Design a protein with these regions (language model features):
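Acidic-enriched and Gly/Ser
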Residues: 2-174
Length: 174
């Protein structure tokens, strides 16, 4: 893949099947296709049922069933990316697949930076670590993080992606 193809990549929002190990399988396959998948993940300690003072660490998706994908549709056609059984579809706004504002993804990467949880997006996570968020951007992302119900976080994400300029994110999509 040459540098021109790397420069023409955009972030898109897509959905995946959450059953079993589908996320890991899909992300591994997308990495093989030279596409960068990423979703905000966190680890939480869950008390074990068989012991009073033991915990397990579990990985949870902030937006279950949703992920961001960095791709150039001239190189990786949409139909080729939809081939994996865990890939549901791209999120459409106004009936079409639209790029997500890069600042939104960078802001989320700044808040959820763990490269161990997302090894395929290591370069993008490193780049996002040096950005600065405005007060409005940070407050909206913090509001999403503090929302307990995943369904509510997903609706806040969809609102943010469709109306980025109303939440402090400048429209900079080509």
């Amino acid at each position: 893949m040459n540098i021109e193809h790397l420069n023409n990549r955009n972030w898109y929002l897509a959905q995946y099947n959450t059953a079993g190990k589908n996320r890991e399988s899909l992300f591994s396959w997308l990495n093989e296709q030279n596409v960068v998948p990423w979703t905000p993940l966190i680890t939480r300690k869950i008390r074990r049922a068989d012991s009073r003072c033991c915990y397990r660490e579990r990985i949870f998706a902030i937006f279950p069933g949703y992920f961001f994908i960095l791709a150039n549709f001239d190189i990786q056609p949409v139909s080729a990316l939809r081939r994996h059984s865990a890939f549901i579809d791209f999120v459409k706004f106004g009936g079409e697949i639209k790029p997500v504002n890069k600042d939104i993804v960078d802001g989320l990467m700044k808040i959820y930076p763990d490269p161990v949880l997302n090894p395929g997006a290591r370069e993008e996570l490193n780049a996002a670590s040096s950005i600065w968020l405005t007060k409005a951007q940070y407050q909206y992302l913090l509001r999403m993080e503090n929302t307990l119900q995943p369904e509510s976080r997903i609706s806040l994400l969809l609102e943010l992606v469709s109306n980025a300029e109303h939440h402090g994110f400048i429209v900079n999509i080509p």
